[in-house]
């Protein structure tokens, strides 16, 4: 099973250190090596410090026993943004220069199964805020995408969840099962802003504003 180390405010420093010790125990035979988000080699101490103090996850690398830092707030540009509009049935929105707001749910995990943010009333309130921001900041109605449907039944009345179409969002933005949920806001220019793993809802509006400002 793939494992990841997560950096969240609601987790204590002691909890994170316990996770690190667990990784160390399982990694003795594998001779773990560590890399930063650019692929450069770093020490275990540097790896752990980045997760404890910065916006990073630690995820398994391509090689056995390798752990790699992943920056939680990626900003970039995709080569073919139109495919994401097509896969979600929003071709017209692409031609109208509208943003896509995508909330990605990996499936039930310890984070979203025990978070007050996933209370039905909290989710309903969040959905209303996203609808309002979408209309205000030139975006299509929010798109709710899942990898594993488990745990979503309680939100069906006010959120239209759909399977990740052909896995395009996982492949491009969410290659690991980042905890709780993640989001990406995509502009027709291909520019995007995302947060991997649990996030303050207000950051979606921040992303919309920044993308609109950059693409005037």
Which functions belong to the PLM regions below?
Residues 112-115, 155-156, 196-197:
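Short, solvent-exposed loop/turn and secondary-structure capping segments
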